[in-house]
Amino acid sequence: MGLQSYFKGLYQRTMRQAYGKAIDEICLALQTSPGRVLDCGAGEGAMFETLNQRLSLERDRYTGVEWNPPLVDAARAKGLNVLQGDLNRALEFADESFGCVFALSVLEHLLNPCRFLREVHRVLESQGVLVILTPNISTYFTAALILAGKMPSSGPHPDSDALIKNEEVFKVSDESLQPDTEIDTPSHRHLVVFSYRVLKRYLRMLGFREIEGRGFGLYPFPNFAQPFLERVDPWHCHQMVFVARK
C-alpha cells in the first residue's frame, strides 16, 4: 500500500466515523425533543432524507438554509422547506425557534463563523441542542506541514486552485470534487478553521452548556489504533464533533 492509499484510508474512516457520530447525536436530540430542526448548509436536503429514514422525521419539523439557489430549488422540488440564505448573516428566524440546530462541514466555509454560532444560540430554544462537525486546525499533521514550510491542508485555503494542487501532499478527497476556490462563491474552500480547545471555549463563552466534544482521525497513526487514540487525545484529531445545549 502506498502512502497516498494509506492516508486516503485514514481520511475515509475519519469522515465515516465523524458523520456517524454527528447523525447519532442529531437523532438523539430529535427523539428527546418535539421541537423543530434547522439544517444549516442543507444542500438538496440529503440530511432530511437520512433523518427521515432513521426517525420518520415529519417534513413540518424540518427547515433548511442553503446559499446555492440551484440546490435550494432541488430541495424545494422534493417538498422540503429549504430557504435561500447566507449563514454569514443574521438568521431570519425568531428567538428560540428550534429544538435542534446542526451544521455539518459548514463552519469552516464561513467568513463569520463566530457570528453564525451567536445566531444559532439565539434561535435555539432553552434546552435546545447544537451539533457541529468541522475540521480541526490543531493537528500533528498540520504541525508537520507548517514545519515543512507548507500551508495546513485543513485550511484556510488560498484562492488559487493551481497552488492548492501544487502544495497538496496526498489526494484524499473524492476524485469527483471539482476545485472552485477561484470563484466568488466557492463550496469547498475553507476560510476559518478552529482548534478543538478554542471552539469549545467559544461555545462556553456564548452560554452553551453540557458541551461535549469528540475527535476523529489522529494522523498518521493506523486505523486499528484510532478508536483508542481518539479517546486519549481528541484535541489533535483531524475532525471534531461538538454537541452543546442551550
Indicate where each model-derived feature is located.
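Conserved N-terminal segment of class I S-adenosyl-L-methionine
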Residues: 1-94, 100-104, 192, 215-226, ...
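S-adenosyl-L-methionine-dependent methyltransferase catalytic module, highlighting the catalytic core
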Residues: 46, 50, 111-119, 129-245
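Conserved strand-to-helix beginnings and helix N-cap segments that scaffold or border functional pockets
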Residues: 76, 95, 113-117
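Ser/Thr-centric signal marking residues that sit
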Residues: 63, 123, 134
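Secondary-structure boundary/capping motif
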Residues: 71-74, 78, 102, 122-123, ...
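A short His-aromatic
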Residues: 105-109
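A generic alpha-to-beta junction signature in SAM-dependent methyltransferases
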Residues: 30-31, 117, 124
